[in-house]
């Protein structure tokens, strides 16, 4: 698995747009692409999915969460490890781990866990590595 990640603290510099277009370009070249939207604004998910798909995905009454929050839920609730990774098929070679506006609630878990890793607390390591392991799980599907 080769990984390409974009990071910049400044917003509005084109990270999401660049990633969206690179995903399509690599897919056109025959590469299998997994796009993970771990930005709490979920703009990348909004670019890939239609309005009706987004409404279904983020419907609070939808019992089956199909966003990144589904595998994170057990970690957030302190009930164990990550759950199954939901994937949306965008095109034959593109899969998406959909973002969620509620992902911002996980940021506090990450900051708390970071310090606890220094004390070698196993749940903290599960928390800090969860997003990476969600990507690995999705890539294996």
Regions found by a protein language model. Give the residues of each.
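P-loop NTP-binding core
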Residues: 1-141
